[in-house]
Amino acid sequence: MGFCAALNMDLWSAMSSSINVSPNHSRLIRIAAALLIGPDGRTLLVRKRGTTAFMQPGGKIEPHELPVHALARELEEELGLDIDPAQAVYLGHFSAPAANEPGFVVHAELFQLNIDSDVTPAAEIEEVIWIDPATEGGVVLAPLTRDLILPFYRASLTAIA
């Protein structure tokens, strides 16, 4: 039983919700992100070319695109990972300062996927690492990952233990 089984959400409603980015909100970056969990419980993080911070894989949601479909597209482009969107479990909406765009805020729709396949960095991804969620892996982490997603994952593991 995955840690998300306790979350009883209206998945369709969550996946189809959107944030209106008007000219007054032009400093917002709307993304879909993945908490990719391997068989050993570690989570996959990526680092974009020319940056220092590791973060969840994913990317920007195109206009009129469902977050889960954006996630599937980005995982295929960045990691060669072909996922079934129906297998992605919606975890919620998380916001934090953007790691690579000073002055911007990232609004992330986060999904969990359990994977047991190899990934290959592609597109703008320079490096991938698997880290134990109990640690920070000894690397620089994006604010969203460090302050929200990893603590959320740790708390969920404690809740089901």
Task: Mark where each language-model region is.
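Conserved N-terminal beta-strand and adjoining loop/helix that marks the start
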Residues: 16-43, 60
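NUDIX/MutT-family hydrolases
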Residues: 110-112, 120-154
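Conserved Nudix-box catalytic region and its N-terminal flanking loop in Nudix hydrolases
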Residues: 38, 42-78, 82
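A short coil-to-beta-strand element that immediately follows conserved catalytic motifs
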Residues: 82-92
